[in-house]
Structures are given as C-alpha cells and as structure tokens.
C-alpha cells in the first residue's frame, strides 16, 4: 500500500464487493418483508358499480384507420383499496392500475386494457376510496367494435423499489362488466363517412400491423373499396392468421 | 525489449478490454437483448425513473403483461424508449402492445412510425425492465456527453493496468 | 534483460517482479538454457482470445443483434473454452517463472511467489517434472537487494545455486 494507484485499486475492489453484498442483502430483506406482509393476496379491496359507455371516434388518435368509425369505451367505477402493506422502506412508488381482460375472436387470443391508473408515492395516500371514478383513457380494441363482450376487471399494482427488482401483483378483488354497445341509430353518422375525401396517406415500407376493419354496413363499404385499391394489402385482424 | 515481455504486457492490458467486452456480449446473449443494461435518458417515466438510473432488461418473456415497463425501439430509429405497457392484445401467434410514459399525458401513438398503431412484442422490444439501480448510470451520461471525462477514464484504466504487477 | 534500476524496497510486488526478471540471467550463469514453450503457449492462447474478441467486436459493428446471434454464441463458446484451457494451464504451472534445460538435458522448473506483505522470495525448484525432486526455499529479499534498492546478481546467483546444487547432488 505504498502508492496512490495500489491504494485506489484496493479501495475500489473492496467497494465493489461490499456494494454487491449490500444490494443482495437489501433485495432479500425487501422480498422477505413483502412475503411477510402477504402482499400477493391483498383482499382489502373491492371494485364495483361499473358503468361502461361507448362512443364512435374517427381520429387516428382514437384508434381509427383512414377515418373509419372505431368504437371507444370508457367506464365509471367505484373502488376501495388498502394498499398500505405494499409500502416499506425500499418502496419508491407504487403504480396501481385498473385493467379489464376480455377474450378475442379466436381461441388463444385475449386482450387486456388499462382504464385507469395512479401513482402512489407515500403510505398515507395508499388507501384508495373512489366513487364514480371516471376512466382515464378512452380504450379501443384491435377489432372495430367491442361487440358487448364480457370483461373481467382487476386492480393491479407495481412496486418500484429504491434498489432491486420491480415487483408486480394483483389484488384479489375482481368484477365483471359487459362493454356497452352503440345504439343502432348511430348508423346515420356512419353514412356520412362516404362523403369524406379518401385520405391517401404515404405508404412506407415499414407499415406494421394494420388491422383490417370488421365487415361494415353496405353504404360505407363501397367507399372503402374505392380506397382500398390504392392501399397496400391490409393485414388481417389479430385473431386470424397474420398474412406476413 | 524482449518481444515476449512486450507481448505479455500487451496481453494483460488487452485482457481488461476483451473480458469486459465478452461479459457484455454474453449478457446480451443470455437476456436475448442487444442492450441488456440501459441508462435512463429522459424524464418521461418520473417519478419512477430519473435520468441516470440503470435498468436491467430481460427479453425472453413469451408475452408482455399490462403494467410491465418495457424498452422499445421504433424501426428505423435508434432511440430506445422506456415506457409502460398500457394495453395488450394477443393471439397464439403474436402480441400487440400500446405503451405510455407515466409522466406523459397521452399514450405513445404519436411516437410510433407513421400508421403504426401498436408495437409488436417480438420485434420491437429491446427487453422488459426487471431490476433497477438508482443514479449510478450518471457516469455513462457523463462519458457520452462529456468528451474529456471519457478519455480521462480510459487513460486511467490503461495506466492502472500498466502500473500493477500483482 | 532489464538494466539495473532502483526498486522500491517497500513494495513486495516490485521486489518479486524484479527478481523474476533476473531469473533467466542467473540461471544462464548456472548453465541452463531457457525453454520458452510454456510462455509461448500462454501468449498464443492469450492472443487468440484477443483475436476472438476483436472479431466479435467487428461483427457487432457490422451486423445487428438478431442476424449475428448464433455467430456470437459460437464465438463466445470458443472464447470460454480457450479461457478454460488457459486456466488449466496456469493452474498446472502455478507461479512458474522459468523453465530451462541443462546441457545434459535435465529440465529445471522454477516457481516463485511471495505472500502479500512478507519480503521473502519463495522458490520451488523441480527437476525433470519429478515431484520428488523438489525443493522449496525461502530467500529473503534483504539478502540480494542492497540498502538503496539495487539488485545484486552475484548475491542472488550464489544463493540460488546453493539451493539448486543441493538437489542436484541428491539426484546424482
């Protein structure tokens, strides 16, 4: 230990080994604590009073391709949850989100969407009591419409630690609802699409995963057929065998 | 000087670089990701991730789950983006994802390529974030953004190897 | 051969390194000719790992991850195999600093090491790879480094040869 370089190296080596050891210990303690607090089976939650609503959107930002009608869904819900057991000294933040899982068209296909999420930073804010909470996001499916399918709603959480692995889980509470269906009188709105100028967008080679719309009512179909000639072959819906 | 001595000295210096590189490549193969350790560069995932945090990725999951934090790159652009999966749709062949940064008001639709509505889980993802170290990556931000720092560090490494005989 | 330079008497590592460097000269004086087979093997293995790493680097620059995946796996596998071989070679020749042959064809292997803070040069001399004809000697650095830090070849050669002759006599 007679010169700076050797001393520096020795210190660095020691620092490295000790920090690895410390981190491993921290992670082990955190996980043990979480197991102890039974966080993977939080049953002090309830979700209910889900009232779904649906609307038709035509903008790309709401899932529409080429200004075709796209069904968007939102829900309102009540939520009670006590997530205080997720907070320990190694918890930096907890991300909670309300998801809805519903089936797709073919066997083995499934979808899961987030309607609402929230970042909880401290233990004091970890008790949630929401009444008639509006969903944060307007949700659309890969298909053109939700077809009134049944969805299972869950409250899921994600612990972001100060150091270590990200931890995920879901609470025991579940609820179900059926997606709202658009009333038939909306047909008038769909007919208007015929008069809209076909928007020819640049087809680049990297176009990915274009989802073909479901068979749509007659009047609009003709307009769309005119458009389709100019487009690249559109890919099949997710639940059928993809072309490429 | 003796050529054998010179070669031996060269080898001990080269060893530092070759072993570091081999470890990096092995990590990439094990995790199936071309960049298994990333440093957070933007604030779009705050307060979870800050600039300078180190993320450890894993890319051998069959499917991503809603709520997972993933790193993806849009085809044709080399910028990795770290965001959370907001929605997923899958069948037995593939999975499509929609992502959003926690600190952003809207989802990532505007970040994708033109006309791209979803990410493909198999081809667009660099990996999903499994673990996290705070702030230590700031050194690499300094190295990439501050030229003097980079060469200073390299120089220090070389000197320290040449001077050690233990 | 390194020209005589002042060695830091407080660094056991420096003392040992300097003595190692002077071994070939000392043994030449005792009638041995150095064999470079081990050194060359180590260098060759080392260079091949550098070559592989270099190749990997070039591939990494040129091709993207998915394309180069299996080549990378293969190259890494070869790298680790060679590293393993190097590990074994080094283990079997632990601390060997000199291998030479006498005019009569007798092989001498000299291993030398130091413990971290003791200024003692441990020397293990083996003849003809025979574990029975091995002697280990402890040569304090003080005996062949003078007060100012200069290496004394005469003192070292004398000290070394006295130990070697002990075994030589035993052999014959």
UniProtKB/Swiss-Prot annotation, chain B:
Protein name: Signal peptidase complex catalytic subunit SEC11
Gene Ontology MF: a single term: serine-type endopeptidase activity
Catalytic reaction(s) noted: Cleavage of hydrophobic, N-terminal signal or leader sequences from secreted and periplasmic proteins
Lumenal side: 31-166
Signal peptide: none
Record note on quaternary structure: Component of the signal peptidase complex (SPC) composed of a catalytic subunit SEC11 and three accessory subunits SPC1, SPC2 and SPC3. The complex induces a local thinning of the ER membrane which is used to measure the length of the signal peptide (SP) h-region of protein substrates. This ensures the selectivity of the complex towards h-regions shorter than 18-20 amino acids. SPC associates with the translocon complex.
UniProt topology in membrane: Single-pass type II membrane protein
EC number, UniProt record: 3.4.21.89
Function in brief: Catalytic component of the signal peptidase complex (SPC) which catalyzes the cleavage of N-terminal signal sequences from nascent proteins as they are translocated into the lumen of the endoplasmic reticulum. Specifically cleaves N-terminal signal peptides that contain a hydrophobic alpha-helix (h-region) shorter than 18-20 amino acids.
Gene assigned in the entry: SEC11
Spans through the membrane: 10-30
Localization: Endoplasmic reticulum membrane
Active site: 44, 83, 108
Gene Ontology terms: cellular component: signal peptidase complex
Species name: Scheffersomyces stipitis (strain ATCC 58785 / CBS 6054 / NBRC 10063 / NRRL Y-11545)
Family, per entry: Belongs to the peptidase S26B family.
Cross-referenced CDD domains: S26_SPase_I (cd06530)
Domain comment as written in the entry: The C-terminal short (CTS) helix is essential for catalytic activity. It may be accommodated as a transmembrane helix in the thinned membrane environment of the complex, similarly to the signal peptide in the complex substrates.
């Amino acid at each position: 230990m007679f010169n700076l370089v050797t001393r520096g190296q020795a210190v660095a080596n020691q620092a490295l080994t000790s920090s690895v050891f410390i981190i491993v210990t921290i992670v082990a303690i955190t996980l043990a604590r979480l197991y102890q607090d039974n966080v993977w089976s939080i049953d002090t939650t309830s979700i209910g009073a889900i009232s779904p609503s649906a609307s038709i959107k035509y903008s790309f930002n709401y899932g529409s391709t080429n200004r075709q009608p796209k069904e968007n869904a939102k829900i309102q819900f009540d939520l009670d949850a006590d997530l205080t057991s997720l907070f320990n000294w190694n918890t930096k933040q907890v991300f909670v989100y309300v998801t809805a899982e519903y089936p797709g068209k073919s066997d083995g296909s499934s979808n899961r969407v987030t309607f609402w999420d929230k970042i909880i930073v401290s233990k004091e804010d970890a008790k949630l009591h929401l009444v008639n909470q509006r969903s944060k996001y307007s949700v659309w499916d890969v298909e053109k419409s939700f077809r009134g399918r049944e969805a299972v709603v869950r409250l899921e959480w994600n612990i972001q630690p100060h150091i270590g692995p990200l931890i995920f889980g879901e609470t025991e509470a579940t609820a179900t609802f059926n997606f709202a269906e658009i009333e038939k009188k909306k047909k008038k709105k769909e007919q208007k699409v015929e008069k809209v100028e076909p928007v020819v967008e640049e087809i680049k080679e990297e176009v990915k995963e274009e989802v073909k719309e479901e068979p749509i009512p007659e009047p609009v179909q003709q307009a769309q057929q005119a458009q389709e000639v100019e487009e690249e072959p559109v890919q099949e819906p997710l639940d059928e065998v993809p072309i490429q | 000087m003796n050529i054998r001595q010179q070669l031996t000295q060269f080898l001990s210096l080269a060893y530092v670089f070759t072993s570091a590189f081999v470890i990096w490549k092995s990590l990439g193969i094990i995790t199936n990701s071309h960049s298994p350790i990333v440093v957070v560069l933007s604030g779009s995932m705050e307060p979870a991730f800050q600039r300078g945090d180190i993320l450890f990725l894993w890319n051998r999951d069959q499917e991503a789950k809603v709520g997972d934090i993933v790193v993806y790159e849009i085809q044709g652009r080399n910028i990795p983006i770290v965001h959370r999966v907001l929605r997923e749709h899958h069948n037995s062949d593939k999975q499509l994802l929609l992502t959003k940064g926690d600190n952003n008001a809207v989802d990532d639709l505007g970040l994708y390529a033109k006309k791209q509505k979803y990410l493909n889980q198999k081809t667009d993802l660099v990996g999903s974030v499994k673990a996290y170290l705070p702030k230590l990556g700031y050194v690499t931000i300094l190295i990439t953004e501050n030229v003097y720092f980079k060469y200073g560090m390299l120089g220090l490494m070389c000197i320290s190897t040449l001077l050690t005989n233990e | 051969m390194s020209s005589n330079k002042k060695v830091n008497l407080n660094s056991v590592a420096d003392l040992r390194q300097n003595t190692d460097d002077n071994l070939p000269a000392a043994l030449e004086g005792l009638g041995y000719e150095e064999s470079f087979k081990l050194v060359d093997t180590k260098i060759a293995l080392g260079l091949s790992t550098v070559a592989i790493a270099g190749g990997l680097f070039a591939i990494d620059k040129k091709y993207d991850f998915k394309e180069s995946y299996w080549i990378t796996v293969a190259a890494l596998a070869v790298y680790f195999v060679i590293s393993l071989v190097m590990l074994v070679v080094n283990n079997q020749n632990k601390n060997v600093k000199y291998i030479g042959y006498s005019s009569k064809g007798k092989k001498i292997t000299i291993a030398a090491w130091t413990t971290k803070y003791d200024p003692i040069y441990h020397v293990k001399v083996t003849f003809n790879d025979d574990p029975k004809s091995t002697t280990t000697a402890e040569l304090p650095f003080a005996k062949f480094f003078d007060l100012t830090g200069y290496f004394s070849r005469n003192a070292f050669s004398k000290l070394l040869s006295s130990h070697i002759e002990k075994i030589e006599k035993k052999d014959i």
